[in-house]
């Protein structure tokens, strides 16, 4: 295995492990909260901490060494999944939040890390995140719907995966540097202060920054904040807005509409593993993730520079699925399953093409920052979807019950 293949393989694993717990938790949403609670509650807990991390990360993450980040990711992921596999709903929610922090922190970190290894690393990461979807959802479906293992045991089995982050230490990280907030910022001033302290005889003077230096630190921090906001603003229209809207549409489908895309269990032509209504929800999630995996793995070979076109297509998918849930146009799940798979293809393609556009169009000196910052967009779209879904799913379900289709209230 040459160096490029090695980098691709490692980043593929990083992408898979970083996202797989997020996928497993969403796949288990119907099992965690039951049929009567909106599944977007789990989505909200699964995305809010991640979004907060991504929004605030550009202001502080540069000062945290990658080594420390790796250990934090492992701890948060493992402890979080142990909590999720517990019996208490409150403990499950805390565990989901911890796994979410790990996912958001990991995505920003590895996207920034890919800057040092160029497009090869980003391709591996993108494919790996797509692989996380199909691995997480299909393995969970296999364990619970086919092998019929207990839900809690199935969730607990995923705690071993985060230790794969240790492969980071097998990378050539000599080229990675940790810069201070700015060349004239706090770190430089502290180093100068420490150097001057060696020339003094008084302990108090050795640890105290002068007023001038403190003022310089404050001014430098303000300048850094302003420049960060300016850089973020430049990324909104070309990259963040279309990516955010794609994720808004697809997660409304996945977590708010798909739990209501149900069919009678005694219908002819149902897949043999549709033994319960929750099996339909889990299957939709697996098909979506299969589409994401395929498109994230191949999208770099079929480039799409117009990101808003992908957003429009995903919006059309949302309209079609809402119509099906509301009117019950199709009476067999197969067309819906194909549509969900296609939805995944669009979502994965949008993700990869967004970050490839950043690599191709953003200046080298701003590329590392931009890759991490644009990752805010997908989480923001998912967060909005979670809020909207809290009302959308119950509305559709109540309508179905009133028209003689009570399946959304059944297990």
Swiss-Prot record:
GO cellular component, one term: fungal-type vacuole
Family: Belongs to the battenin family.
Keyword field: Amino-acid transport, Membrane, Signal, Transmembrane, Transmembrane helix, Transport, Vacuole
GO terms (BP aspect): L-arginine transmembrane transport; lysine transport; regulation of intracellular pH
Keyword Isomerase recorded: no
Residues annotated as transmembrane: 41-61, 79-99, 127-147, 149-169, 281-300, 307-329, 334-356, 371-391
Residues making up the signal peptide according to the UniProt record: 1-29
InterPro entries cross-referenced by the UniProt entry: Battenin_disease_Cln3, Battenin_disease_Cln3_subgr, MFS_trans_sf
Gene3D superfamilies xrefs: MFS general substrate transporter like domains (1.20.1250.20)
Domain of life (superkingdom): Eukaryota
Localization per Swiss-Prot or TrEMBL: Vacuole membrane
Function description: Involved in vacuolar transport and vacuole pH homeostasis. Also required for cytokinesis.
Protein name as it appears in the record: Protein BTN1
Membrane-topology annotation of the record: Multi-pass membrane protein
Gene assigned in the entry: BTN1
